[in-house]
């Protein structure tokens, strides 16, 4: 049977999602758990495919993976989670066709970036985001990774404010390396008045204008989900969702305390 899983993780401790030698990655922990639980023998023999890799420090709520297994009764969230560290958890599973490709069959991907701080002109950021919608050459918004084409299509960009937090949601068919984080940098620069819409239009024409911009920090980015249309009937594991929510609530309390501690460590004249 071929199984698909929805996977979440806090990327802070990992050097990305894709397995690499000598460093901690999400897939390193995932493969270890799947092998130890005898769900798969190896990623290669199980035809393991991931919807898309995330960079070091990037988080996920709805990463999707798929693999073949002779033990589908074990390939369920609460069993797999027993072999994973608390910063990685599976929360939904589904039976899929043997030809299901988690990467190629994706209809769209949804990313969210969280910015802390005030002083952004949100109306300018929203107007600028409209220029990015549709199909464009995003070469100026990517880091070279051997891509054959840098043309991508963005379906939706939403900029909203929640207190002193600004959230930017980006939905598209696929994304280049660092593309979302560089889009966030561009919108932030416009929101601060450093650049304007004419500059953004130039950035979308790399044949006549080239400029490298730094990607926004990885810690603010989360892969929220991958959409496959009506192709998959997901079964959510309420126990795994509730357990992860409880753990994250405890993390939030700890981080709030740490934020106060750091405030105390700031030198005041």
Curated annotation (Swiss-Prot):
Species of origin: Methanosarcina mazei (strain ATCC BAA-159 / DSM 3647 / Goe1 / Go1 / JCM 11833 / OCM 88) (Methanosarcina frisia)
Catalytic activity, reaction form: uridine(38/39/40) in tRNA = pseudouridine(38/39/40) in tRNA
Active-site residues from the entry: 55
Function statement: Formation of pseudouridine at positions 38, 39 and 40 in the anticodon stem and loop of transfer RNAs.
Protein name as catalogued: tRNA pseudouridine synthase A
Coiled-coil stretches: none
Keyword terms of this UniProt record: Isomerase, tRNA processing
Gene Ontology MF terms: RNA binding; tRNA pseudouridine(38-40) synthase activity
InterPro entries assigned: PsdUridine_synth_cat_dom_sf, PsdUridine_synth_TruA, PsdUridine_synth_TruA_a/b_dom, PsdUridine_synth_TruA_C, TruA/RsuA/RluB/E/F_N
Domain of life of the organism encoding this protein: Archaea
One protein family per Pfam: PseudoU_synth_1
Biological process according to GO: tRNA pseudouridine synthesis
Keyword hit for Chloroplast: no
Enzyme class: isomerase
EC number of this enzyme: 5.4.99.12
Residues binding substrate, per UniProt: 111
Sequence similarity: Belongs to the tRNA pseudouridine synthase TruA family.
Taxonomy of the source species: Archaea, Methanobacteriati, Methanobacteriota, Stenosarchaea group, Methanomicrobia
């Amino acid at each position: 049977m071929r199984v698909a899983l929805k996977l979440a993780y806090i990327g802070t401790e990992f050097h990305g999602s894709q397995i690499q030698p000598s460093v901690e990655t999400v897939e390193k922990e995932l493969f270890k758990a799947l092998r130890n639980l005898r769900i798969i023998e190896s990623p290669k023999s199980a035809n393991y495919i991931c919807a898309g890799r995330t960079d070091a420090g990037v988080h996920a709520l709805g990463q999707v993976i798929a693999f073949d297994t002779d033990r589908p009764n074990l390939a369920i969230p609460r069993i797999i989670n027993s072999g994973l560290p608390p910063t990685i958890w599976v929360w939904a599973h589904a039976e899929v066709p043997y030809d299901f490709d988690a990467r190629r069959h994706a209809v769209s991907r949804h990313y969210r970036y969280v910015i802390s701080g005030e002083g952004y002109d949100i109306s300018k950021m929203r107007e600028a985001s409209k220029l990015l919608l549709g199909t464009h050459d995003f070469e100026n918004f990517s880091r070279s990774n051997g891509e054959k084409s840098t043309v991508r299509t963005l379906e939706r960009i939403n900029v909203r404010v929640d207190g002193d937090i600004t959230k930017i949601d980006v939905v598209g068919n696929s994304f280049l390396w660092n593309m979302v984080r560089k889009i966030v940098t561009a919108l932030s620069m416009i929101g601060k008045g450093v650049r304007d819409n004419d500059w953004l239009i130039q950035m979308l024409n790399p044949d006549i204008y080239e400029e490298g911009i730094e990607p926004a920090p990885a810690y603010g980015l989360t892969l929220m989900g991958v959409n496959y249309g009506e192709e998959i009937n997901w079964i959510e594991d309420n126990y795994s969702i509730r357990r992860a929510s409880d753990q994250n609530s405890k993390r939030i309390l700890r981080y709030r305390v740490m934020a106060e501690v750091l405030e105390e460590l700031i030198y005041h004249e």
